[in-house]
């Protein structure tokens, strides 16, 4: 009896864990997604309906509750604006994410496409994310163009997302 319970428990745990493992081990996942933040999405695999949370590799967007300052000194939530921009970009579209990896924080990262366009670069080009030099220098040129055109976050005064996160950690201690 105890043995049967043990086997049943293991089977349930495997069933709960398996979709995440299988999604991460795949080379490519296509499906619809929802924006969780300006650089993170939850992708639903078209094939097996599993879901995986993916941060767009090589970019960094303001966090939710990260405020920016307008030229007139008004504070606005740039994290929400960045999330809404990503949400509008991916709405009702099928994404394909490839090159899955885990960064040093354990977050799953990927390069994602909307058709033949790289979503990661689209977000930086729109000005709602920055090149995340800790991972890649691929988007530095695109970031510079967005910054000079004052697109997205570049029209405001703000802390770089990684600096803002460090400050939040220090304040929480």
Question: PLM ranges: what are they?
Answer:
Residues 2-9, 13-173:
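Small beta-barrel nucleic-acid-binding modules, primarily SNase/OB-fold domains
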